[in-house]
């Protein structure tokens, strides 16, 4: 066991444009190689596209999209007497958010649109409308948990 003290998690500062910690986290997840200004341009550009397409507040659309992506259950491996079982467990709130943001950006990168702004906007709008790859991933995760419900008593 490590003997060092507990290191507190650093608080994420809200982004300058929308004053939202959620947007700030999205920017950090999009960021590659420490290039934050580029990820900010991508994020804000995607929000502009969302505003043009829906005519609604892009922050509200984004928040609803994230709520739609968040998984409730997931399976985690657990070894019991030489066999590894996939045990369904409830996802902690902070992990729900990080998984949702990660899935959103991962599947946005895999889309066919020309620029990352368009891809991200498309994926957010799809998630808002309960369709798209990130929603499919959540459903897949829930299906796995449901299929392994018999092992739920192995929870720890």
Swiss-Prot record:
GO terms classed as biological process: ribosomal small subunit assembly; translation
Keywords: Ribonucleoprotein, Ribosomal protein, RNA-binding, rRNA-binding, tRNA-binding
Any one cellular-component term (Gene Ontology): ribosome
One Gene Ontology MF term: tRNA binding
Coiled coil: none
PROSITE patterns documented for this protein: RIBOSOMAL_S7 (PS00052)
Alphabetical list of Pfam families matching this protein: Ribosomal_S7 (PF00177)
CDD domains found in the cross-reference section: uS7_Bacteria
Transmembrane domains' residue ranges: none
Entry's family note: Belongs to the universal ribosomal protein uS7 family.
Protein function: One of the primary rRNA binding proteins, it binds directly to 16S rRNA where it nucleates assembly of the head domain of the 30S subunit. Is located at the subunit interface close to the decoding center, probably blocks exit of the E-site tRNA.
Oligomer status and interactors: Part of the 30S ribosomal subunit. Contacts proteins S9 and S11.
Name under which the protein is recorded: Small ribosomal subunit protein uS7
Organism: Thermodesulfovibrio yellowstonii (strain ATCC 51303 / DSM 11347 / YP87)
């Amino acid at each position: 066991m490590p003997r060092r003290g507990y290191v507190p998690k650093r608080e994420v500062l809200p982004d300058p444009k929308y004053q939202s910690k959620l947007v700030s986290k999205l920017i950090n997840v999009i960021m590659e190689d420490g290039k934050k200004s580029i990820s900010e341009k991508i994020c804000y550009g995607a929000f502009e596209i969302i505003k043009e397409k829906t005519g609604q507040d892009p922050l509200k659309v984004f928040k609803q999209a994230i709520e739609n992506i968040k998984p409730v259950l997931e399976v985690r491996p657990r070894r019991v007497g030489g066999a590894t079982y996939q045990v369904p467990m409830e996802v902690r709130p902070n992990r729900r958010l990080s998984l949702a943001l990660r899935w959103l950006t991962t599947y946005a990168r895999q889309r066919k649109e020309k620029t990352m702004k368009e891809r991200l906007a498309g994926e957010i709008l799809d998630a808002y409308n309960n369709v798209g790859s990130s929603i499919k991933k959540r459903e897949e995760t829930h299906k796995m948990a449901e299929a392994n419900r018999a092992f739920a008593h192995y929870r720890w």
